[in-house]
């Protein structure tokens, strides 16, 4: 017989179909991953139960912590991102919150890019301070500013591969080097890029998060998030993360770095934060995300192909003031970063400024028929929204401008429809304003 599938070095398109279920279900022979719709699991005996709870025997304990359907999804995402382990949770917001809560505690500090999703900005600027965690927001393209923002109590840098909503490309490798020089990890939100286009761990990132609701699911049918542990950050050598390295009083005095090795980071989130706060993903949503993963590469290729044609159309439209997409950026830094991180193209979520004011932008949106006006992105269907009054409305006028969001800014998420139909819909809306 040939080499077992799990022992082969498989390409991305194969990994997205097979990891976690290299063979049919051993009980039923089902080739599709079954939905294990259960709240709990039977132990063989009392000793077996104690071993599971003590983390000396790996396996299912309770549905809030693990599920076999979820496990396949986690294995597959970890493989696609090149990490050692992953944890799926109830939303992308939960993934980000758990990641940063696992790094910073009361009295500690985070450095974050100022071009991140408005919800994450709000979490860091307003919610975390209530728990004693502060954040300094920096221009991710001003590396001196990034470095100078790091304090003695800083525990992480957080960035997004592509800024939200303008899709500016961040230099992951450069910021990872700054973080590591100060013995802190870099966490990267890779939602907008997907591992098919960029794998941040290969450029020095330590933790990757996703809103699985977006490209991973791809069809707007489920809410979920995922955290991928790169497994390479040396928590013990850093000396800044005692909750990972020292005996944890919340879990029988266990040291997560000793008990879980390279997967210590996500293991602690599962064992402590998920256990205590319960942002658990449902088995059915895990199943839906697995369906999405099976076509991720195919969909992203079409998203990118369509987006680049729409960008070209908008860039030559006399009613457009400016298109914010790295493929047409006049900034030589952005041009170089786009070439480095997106050799096959990228960025199907981007913004443009229509000539006119906020009302012009809203009138344009209201005249679109093919595009759906909603808060999600990365659906196979094309989507549109006015960021200043919706997704980023919690920001002040000054904060909006810092993120490059103006009253006449419109965000598009280009779907997989025929691109001629997409452009026709845009053209009719332009004609109406």
Residue ranges and their predicted role:
Residues 1-3, 125, 134, 152, ...:
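PLP-dependent enzyme catalytic core of the Aspartate aminotransferase-like
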Residues 2-67, 75-76:
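N-terminal "arm"/small-domain region of PLP-dependent enzymes with the aminotransferase-like
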Residues 2-8, 20-24, 86-316:
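Conserved PLP-enzyme active-site core in the AAT-like
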Residues 45-97, 119-126:
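Conserved N-terminal alpha-helix of the aminotransferase class I/II PLP-enzyme fold
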Residues 58, 84, 285, 289, ...:
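Short amphipathic alpha-helical segments
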Residues 157, 225-227, 323, 350, ...:
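Well-ordered beta-strand positions enriched in small/hydrophobic/aromatic, beta-favoring residues
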Residues 228, 351-353, 413-415:
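Short hydrophobic/aromatic beta-strand micro-patches
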């Amino acid at each position: 017989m040939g080499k077992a599938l799990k022992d082969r070095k498989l390409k991305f398109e194969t990994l997205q179909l097979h990891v976690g279920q290299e063979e049919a279900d051993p009980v039923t022979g089902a080739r599709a991953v079954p939905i294990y719709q259960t709240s709990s699991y039977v132990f063989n005996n009392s000793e077996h139960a104690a071993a599971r709870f003590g983390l000396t025997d790996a396996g299912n304990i309770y549905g809030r912590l693990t599920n076999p359907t979820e496990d396949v999804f986690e294995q597959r995402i970890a493989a696609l991102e090149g990490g050692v382990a992953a944890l799926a949770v109830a939303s992308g917001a939960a993934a980000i919150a758990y990641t940063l809560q696992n790094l910073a505690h009361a009295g500690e500090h985070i450095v974050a890019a100022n071009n991140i999703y408005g919800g994450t900005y709000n979490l860091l600027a307003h919610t975390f301070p209530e728990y004693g965690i502060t954040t300094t927001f920096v221009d991710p393209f001003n590396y001196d500013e990034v470095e100078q923002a790091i304090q003695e109590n800083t525990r992480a840098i957080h960035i997004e591969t592509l800024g939200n909503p303008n899709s500016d490309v961040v230099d992951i490798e450069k910021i990872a080097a700054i973080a590591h020089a100060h013995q802190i990890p870099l966490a990267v939100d890779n939602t907008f890029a997907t591992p098919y286009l960029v794998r941040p761990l290969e450029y020095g990132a330590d933790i990757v998060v996703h809103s699985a609701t977006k490209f991973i699911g791809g069809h707007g049918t489920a809410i979920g998030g995922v955290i991928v542990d790169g497994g390479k950050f040396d928590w013990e050598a850093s000396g800044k993360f005692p909750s990972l390295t020292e005996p944890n009083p919340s879990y029988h005095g266990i040291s997560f770095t000793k008990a879980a090795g390279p997967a210590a980071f996500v293991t602690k989130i599962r064992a402590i934060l998920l256990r205590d706060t319960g942002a658990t993903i449902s088995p059915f949503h895990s199943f839906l995300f697995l369906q999405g993963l099976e076509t991720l590469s195919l969909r992203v290729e079409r998203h990118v192909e369509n987006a680049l044609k729409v960008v070209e159309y908008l860039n030559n439209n006399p009613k457009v003031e400016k298109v914010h997409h790295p493929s047409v950026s006049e900034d030589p830094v952005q041009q170089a970063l786009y070439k480095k991180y997106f050799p096959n193209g990228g960025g199907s979520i981007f913004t443009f400024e229509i000539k006119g004011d906020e009302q012009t932008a809203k009138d344009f949106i209201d005249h679109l028929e093919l595009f759906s006006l909603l808060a999600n992105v990365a659906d196979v269907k094309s989507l549109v929204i006015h960021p200043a009054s919706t997704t980023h409305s919690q920001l002040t006028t000054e904060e909006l401008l810092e993120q490059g969001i103006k009253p006449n800014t419109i965000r598009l998420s280009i779907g997989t429809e025929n691109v001629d139909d997409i452009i026709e819909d845009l053209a009719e809306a332009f004609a109406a304003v």
